[in-house]
């Protein structure tokens, strides 16, 4: 169980970081 929970947390963190970077690049290109 702990491994699945940690894996899900890592996946969620990676998805959040990716979305933040994508939004940042979009804003930079928009400017």
Swiss-Prot record:
It is a single-pass membrane protein. The keyword Cytoplasm does not apply. The 4 large subunits of the cytochrome b6-f complex are cytochrome b6, subunit IV (17 kDa polypeptide, PetD), cytochrome f and the Rieske protein, while the 4 small subunits are PetG, PetL, PetM and PetN. The complex functions as a dimer. GO terms for molecular function: electron transporter, transferring electrons within cytochrome b6/f complex of photosystem II activity. It is found in: Plastid, Chloroplast thylakoid membrane. HAMAP family: Cytb6_f_PetL. GO terms for biological process: photosynthesis. This is Cytochrome b6-f complex subunit 6.
């Amino acid at each position: 169980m702990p491994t699945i929970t940690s894996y899900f947390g890592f996946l969620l963190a990676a998805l959040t970081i990716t979305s933040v970077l994508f939004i940042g690049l979009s804003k930079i290109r928009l400017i």
